[in-house]
A protein has these predicted regions:
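Phosphate-binding glycine-rich loops and their immediate beta-loop-alpha structural context
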Residues: 1-56
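Generic alpha-helical propensity signal that fires on short helical segments
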Residues: 28-30, 58, 124-128
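C-terminal functional extensions of proteins
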Residues: 117-194
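Electropositive phosphate-/nucleotide-binding environments in soluble metabolic enzymes
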Residues: 18-21, 25, 50-53, 91, ...
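Acidic-enriched, low-complexity/disordered segments with a strong bias for Aspartate over Glutamate
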Residues: 7, 16, 38, 50, ...
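Glycine-rich anion/phosphate-binding loop at the beta-strand->alpha-helix junction
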Residues: 36-118, 123
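Conserved beta-strand scaffold positions in the cores of enzyme catalytic domains, especially
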Residues: 12, 40-42, 108, 143, ...
Length: 194
């Protein structure tokens, strides 16, 4: 986004769903140093942001009204807790976050976890965690962008969307984007998959 819109401001809101201190996130440090995020906001029990807020609502309002952000990215920091059960993972907070964005008049865009690197079947294609959030937790319709993969992988993703009726509940947007790796290299960012 920043590469094509360098004058736009991006705020990152870190929730308290994982590590609480912002400084533990090397990704945030790198993104801020590269000018890819302009301000940080920690909410709930998380701390160390440029701004600290009580909850997701005050965090979103701070991003828009005080930080003057054009785009707000919300995510937990490093680490995640999970119990191996359908509803027992801290990433379930994504549902309430998307609801809050919509309630405050924003445009909720849900980024699904999609991977083919993890050999566990439940993490092939769209992760079962993302499916749970989009099917059972979020109460509003959201935009879900899906990068177009090679046909076999894309067919798996489309099958999951249809099987869980996510294509009926939400706005699925297929994106032809071969620039992700190029953009990561351009900004000197290194990412890895579970």
């Amino acid at each position: 986004y920043k590469r094509n819109n360098p004058d736009k401001k991006i705020a990152y809101i870190m929730t308290d769903g994982a590590a609480l201190p912002l400084y533990l996130s090397m990704n945030v440090k790198n993104l801020k140093q590269n000018g890819l995020i302009d301000s940080t906001i920690t909410i709930g029990n998380a701390f160390g942001g440029d701004y600290e807020c009580i909850n997701i609502y005050t965090g979103l309002i701070t991003a828009k009204e005080i930080a003057k952000a054009d785009v707000v990215f919300v995510s937990m920091g490093p680490g995640i807790a999970g119990t191996g059960t359908k509803y027992g993972f801290t990433g379930i907070e994504q549902g309430q976050i998307l609801d809050a964005v919509k309630k405050l008049g924003g445009n909720p865009i849900a980024i699904p976890r999609i991977s083919f690197a993890d050999k566990r079947d439940r993490h092939q294609g769209i992760s079962h965690h993302s499916i749970t959030v989009f099917d059972k937790i979020v109460n509003v319709d959201v935009n879900i962008p899906i990068t177009i993969y090679e046909s076999q992988k894309l067919n798996k993703i489309k099958e999951q969307l249809k099987e869980n009726k996510l294509d009926e509940k939400h706005n699925i947007i297929f994106i032809e984007n071969n620039k992700c790796k190029e953009d990561l290299e351009y900004f000197g960012l290194k990412v890895k998959s579970m």
